[in-house]
């Protein structure tokens, strides 16, 4: 419910409105219905009535808030809103004036110092001490006092601070004259002062933080630099005095602005529209000023960003140079390189790189100098209460950090230069890789192996392209990887000089053919019988890898896989067997075996062998002519082999010469000659003079497709083929290759050797007469290991 007094006042105002607007009848009726109305208060007494005045104000506000669409176009409303906006901007400008003025003072102070230093010729290091105010220039002005300083008691020597409503709490208006500037610095500077061991070197992260703070503060200053209007001259004068400056410290634009404000306030007050127009003009002028300052600050920030990017790239280049393979190589170089020959002059491209690096360093130093000058122009401040000693001390701490950082950069660049030069010199001096310890593949580079290599004779240290000299055998200290022995050079035996330098006739260019399962089975059986017979007779099968003195010297281990691969590379084209040199092949004839009194070979009787002399030596001149004709088509090595057999035959015993025994074996059918086409690849068994066993083993073989004529006799089979004449009782069927099995047990009482000294009958004791030996009977046979072992 509305109280009676308020209702009565409203009735009085209604009656007053009716009377003043000449509604007489209505006023009389209203007074009769509500008598005894109080009088109108003097403040509400208006010429047109208080009720009308109130209604006009209410209606204007109502239209602004809930009016029609055309109400926003009202110029009066626009002026009112502009007025409110100007009032807000003035408050911000009032809070930012100290910062702007201090920046101008710092710039002026720094210019004076530069002029003095230029006259005195001070070095660049002292300019840095006064010019590095980047960190402390901006932060000291904005973070000097926290909000709690406002409630602290103040001493008699300090000027009182205005309340928080008059200014922003984060930005001070008055500074205590006796306050220490170091206590008002940014916390980062306090951290530098509190670092142990006097290390006032800011890290990269701290420098980046300081740069970010500077950028943020510059942007805030740009947004808050708005003209100051609506303040009384006394308030403006108080504000300027509180800052510690006067009109002389302001720039030309600010002085003009203050003069305009004073003129406007001294003039009589005009209408509200004129004031708003003046304020808009002032806003335009101030916006132009702000845009100009903002452009300058953006240029400065871009320069700072470029300098920081150059510093970061310089750090990255130095770190990458330290981590590069060239730097690592230079660190690992040994000191004996100092005694090496002088390095040749660097390549022109290397000189260009060094020149580019030098140019980059000089450019970096110039950029650092520009950064220090620009930082000093922005951050160096001129404070009335701050003495020159304290300013030098505060800037000296920051300068020490930057100077140490620059020294470290220069030291790193110098070290990288030296390492690059050293790496180039050492890289050019290492022209011969073999002289630096490089050896053949597969060998470990140990110290003892290098010593052995240095102790080799000259003919082995520098192998010629024509011959291959394997590396020397390392000692056992090299481990199992380096343990291998060279294959002993097979010197020719004194017993067989003619065959020592010849290769086997079976080492041909013809590739081996695959055998059927039946053939392989026969070969396996024949090999098994050979080993069994050797065990019973005490005879050891000759081996390719054995040297001529295999009975007296210990066995040496085989070479490693690498030596075998090198030997495989020396094969003749089109052959599956390695092409061994003249000294690498040693025919395993009975003459090449060592003669010792402890041999267990049994002597054979030659009774039936003498009966077959006519068959063995009965080759007609036609067959000999065919043999000579076929020998023309043979390889030169095979011709030499045949000549060797003939020369060996001449050195045989006198008993064989008297009997004209020709035990020369035919050439291997696997040889790529004209004779090899007359034989089949099937293996055959040879049983010397054992016709019964021979007929049992070869009864199942019926291959007669080669055009060979077989005649079965009592003790032998004569084979007639193109260029062939052999004793079949010795070599078996002609349809088989040389897969020979010797049944020695059946020949114990058959062999008989006759010599000048008498008739010797072999009884298995291994001893003979003076005229003949057991080895002479096998003199004409070439017991090569490859045709026997390979079979085909």
Swiss-Prot record:
GO biological process: cell growth mode switching, budding to filamentous; cellular developmental process; filamentous growth; filamentous growth of a population of unicellular organisms; filamentous growth of a population of unicellular organisms in response to biotic stimulus; filamentous growth of a population of unicellular organisms in response to chemical stimulus; hyphal growth; positive regulation of filamentous growth of a population of unicellular organisms in response to biotic stimulus
Subcellular location: Nucleus
Coiled coil: none
PROSITE patterns found in the cross-reference section: LISH
Biased composition (Basic and acidic residues): 637-652
Extent of Gly residues compositional bias: 755-772
Region (Disordered): 100-184, 286-400, 424-676, 692-724, 755-777
Sequence ranges of Low complexity compositional bias: 100-129, 139-158, 286-308, 330-370, 383-400, 443-467, 524-537, 610-619, 697-721
Stretches assigned to the LisH domain: 6-38
Cellular component annotations (GO), alphabetically ordered: nucleus
GO MF terms held by the record: DNA binding; DNA-binding transcription activator activity
UniProt keywords, alphabetically: DNA-binding, Nucleus, Transcription, Transcription regulation, Virulence
Compositionally biased intervals (Polar residues): 316-325, 425-435, 484-506, 538-549, 620-633
SUBUNIT field: Interacts with EFG1 and MSS11.
Protein purpose: Transcription factor which mediates CO(2) sensing. Required for CO(2)-induced white-to-opaque switching, as well as for filamentous growth and virulence. Required for both normoxic and hypoxic biofilm formation. Hypoxic biofilm formation is a major cause of perseverance and antifungal resistance during infections.
Family: Belongs to the FLO8 family.
The name this protein goes by in its record: Transcriptional regulator of filamentous growth FLO8
